[in-house]
């Protein structure tokens, strides 16, 4: 099987309980990654049909091999924002449930050549898909100091954004910043270490979000996804960043106010302390679930 780094699915039990309302329905994991949630759902609900989608060709190759013998799972490569088109190509109108697990996969985070990792030196890439034209290298080496500071502050929520952006612009006057370790070391020298978390963590997060236009993609995707959800169907979203969660929360609130359905999670669902201890990468995860249609009971 493809050498792909798997990770534990976050809040898997809660997702399985909140997402599935029809045990013979059609469900989509639109950010399938290494197939953690997808595998659990397919095993738990053998009479249901599942579609796993991912934009990353490495993930799709792995998923295709992993689920080759699983009759109720189909794997497709694509962007979750294009879900209506993907379903149309499969001659499917609407589905019973959709899962979005936002953010970065463990494989992407740890693979040096993908350019996401602070610990493993690699090119400044950070693209979820090799089809994308813009890389983190282009952003780091071509944006103005003001533009860089804005990205780092907005998407990384980094208070020292201006100081870091200035250091980047000064450094690239000598030579372009080409690798993840060059950028990580520059940030560390500029702001120093505070605690155990690497000082470049928020900078890398900001560049990843900007490179992949993650927030724009989410804004476009949610109303499109809602269209292909059946009455009574459920949309579950796991976010890891306050800006992502804010977008999801606002859409769900607006839909409920417009009478389009109910928020099944009035209060955001978070992983237990036990899960965080077992899987530290889940610590910032937030789960929200919306049920389309009027008259359902809250879980």
UniProtKB/Swiss-Prot annotation:
Coiled coil: none annotated. It is an enzyme of class 2 (transferase). S-adenosyl-L-methionine binds at residues 35-37, 54, 80, 101, 108. Specifically methylates the N4 position of cytidine in position 1402 (C1402) of 16S rRNA. One of its GO terms (cellular component) is cytoplasm. Its main location: cytoplasm. Keywords: Cytoplasm, Methyltransferase, rRNA processing, S-adenosyl-L-methionine, Transferase. This is Ribosomal RNA small subunit methyltransferase H. PANTHER family: 12S RRNA N4-METHYLCYTIDINE METHYLTRANSFERASE (PTHR11265:SF0), S-ADENOSYL-METHYLTRANSFERASE MRAW (PTHR11265).
């Amino acid at each position: 099987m493809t050498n792909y780094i798997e990770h534990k699915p976050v809040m898997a039990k809660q997702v399985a309980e909140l997402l599935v309302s029809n045990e013979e329905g059609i469900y989509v994991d639109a950010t399938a990654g290494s197939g953690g949630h997808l595998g659990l759902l397919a095993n738990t609900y053998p009479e249901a049909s599942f579609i796993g989608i991912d934009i990353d060709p490495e993930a799709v190759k792995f998923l295709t091999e992993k689920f080759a013998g699983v009759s109720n799972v189909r794997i497709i490569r694509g962007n979750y924002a294009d879900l209506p088109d993907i379903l149309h190509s499969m001659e499917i109108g609407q589905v019973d449930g959709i899962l979005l697990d936002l953010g970065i996969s463990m494989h992407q985070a740890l693979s040096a050549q993908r350019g996401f990792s602070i610990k493993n030196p690699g090119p400044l890439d950070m693209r979820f898909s090799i089809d994308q034209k813009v890389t983190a290298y282009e952003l780091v080496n071509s944006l103005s100091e003001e533009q860089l500071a804005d990205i780092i502050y907005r998407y990384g929520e980094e208070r020292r954004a201006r100081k870091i952006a200035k250091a980047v612009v000064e450094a690239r006057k000598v030579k372009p910043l080409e690798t993840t370790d060059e950028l990580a070391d520059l940030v560390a020298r500029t702001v120093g270490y505070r605690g155990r978390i690497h000082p470049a963590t928020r900078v890398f997060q900001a560049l990843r979000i900007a490179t992949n236009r993650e927030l724009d993609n989410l804004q476009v995707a949610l109303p499109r996804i809602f269209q292909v959800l059946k009455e009574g169907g459920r949309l579950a979203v796991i976010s890891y960043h306050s800006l992502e969660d804010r977008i999801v929360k606002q859409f769900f609130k607006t839909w409920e106010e417009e009478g389009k359905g109910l928020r099944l999670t009035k209060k955001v669902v978070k992983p237990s302390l036990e899960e965080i201890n077992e899987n530290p990468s889940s610590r910032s995860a937030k789960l929200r679930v919306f049920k389309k249609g009027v008259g359902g009971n809250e879980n």
